[in-house]
């Protein structure tokens, strides 16, 4: 096997299919829940956004970007897949927020019809092994999604990695993908449809996510915070939307976002020299919101120090982290 070159591009081309054009009726509908799981930073949120054809889950190069379970719905003719993008499962549980994120991810595995197990190319860690062990013990059909294959120089290594994992667990399908480039996600959608049970659709065809515009606004601000700040902040910052109003006079949304950090040094980091960093964060967040909401957005941001919020379950409950459990 090692002497044969595995042509992933040919594999993409040979299996890609278009969307269904069959009219949907209750008698022939298929619908099911699909959990997207994996360790932090393997591309789960990018994959969800690609599968849905629009951005509903924030992405970042930093691990543990997703803190909540995000539900996205993709309807294609008779088939409706209800995807759940989970926080990355990880071994480290020192803080209350980390424990809650693990619980949120684990609880997403209850009552699902299919699991997409996302791994990063040929890179395998202790966190991957932990997720793998959980899936071995669970009684769910699992599709192995080997993501970021475009970043692996030796394509034979990808094939060998898939073969090794398939020896340890019986996957219903194994699909090499590049979620960022959209490579092979049509093939993955086909495999998902093949495993959806016959059932009436849960949501209207135009429905995309269960998350409110208020929630999406907070996630967009948090994404920009992670994009424009250092490595320390993802675990120590959250965003609370204190105001989210539509004003018919301006035909726009007026949004007040409170950024909570744990230390004064972090506050200074977010604000930046002469307030330049918080201005950049606010501007980029506002542009994304306007694109998502389709209206003018008037965004104001504040930064406040709230020591120990990530270890305070009452604070986490008020911020919506425990509602996911």
UniProtKB/Swiss-Prot annotation:
The keyword Nucleotide-binding applies. Residues 64-68 are annotated as: G2. It is a peripheral membrane protein. One of its GO terms (cellular component) is plasma membrane. Its main location: cytoplasm. HAMAP family: GTPase_Era. This is GTPase Era. It comes from Vibrio cholerae serotype O1 (strain ATCC 39315 / El Tor Inaba N16961).
């Amino acid at each position: 096997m090692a002497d044969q070159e595995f042509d992933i591009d040919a594999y993409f081309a040979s299996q890609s299919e278009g969307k269904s054009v069959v009219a949907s009726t209750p008698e022939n509908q298929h619908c099911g829940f699909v959990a997207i799981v994996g360790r932090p930073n393997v591309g789960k949120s990018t994959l969800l956004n690609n599968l849905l054809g629009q951005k509903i889950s924030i992405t970042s190069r930093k691990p543990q970007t997703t803190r909540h379970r995000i539900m996205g719905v993709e309807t294609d003719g008779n088939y409706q897949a209800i995807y759940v993008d989970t926080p990355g499962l990880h071994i480290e549980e020192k803080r209350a927020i980390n424990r809650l994120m693990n619980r949120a991810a684990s609880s997403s595995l209850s009552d699902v019809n299919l699991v997409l197990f996302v791994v990063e190319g040929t890179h395998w860690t202790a966190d991957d092994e932990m997720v793998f062990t959980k899936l071995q013990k669970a009684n769910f059909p699992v599709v192995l999604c080997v993501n970021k294959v475009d970043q692996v120089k030796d394509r034979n290594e990808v094939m060998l990695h898939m073969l090794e994992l398939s020896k340890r667990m019986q996957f219903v399908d194994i699909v090499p993908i590049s979620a960022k480039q959209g490579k092979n996600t049509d093939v993955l959608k086909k495999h998902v449809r093949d495993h959806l049970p016959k059932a009436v659709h849960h949501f209207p065809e135009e429905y995309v996510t269960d998350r409110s515009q208020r929630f999406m606004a907070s996630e967009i601000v948090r994404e920009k915070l992670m994009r424009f700040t250092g490595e320390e902040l993802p675990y120590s910052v959250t965003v609370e939307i204190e105001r989210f109003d539509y004003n018919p006079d301006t035909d726009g949304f007026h949004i007040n976002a409170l950024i909570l950090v744990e230390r004064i040094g972090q506050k200074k980091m977010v604000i930046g020299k002469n307030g330049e960093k918080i201005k950049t964060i606010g501007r980029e967040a506002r542009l994304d919101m306007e694109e998502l909401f389709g209206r003018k957005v008037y965004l104001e941001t504040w930064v406040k120090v709230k020591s120990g919020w990530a270890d305070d379950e009452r604070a986490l409950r008020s911020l919506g982290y425990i509602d996911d459990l």
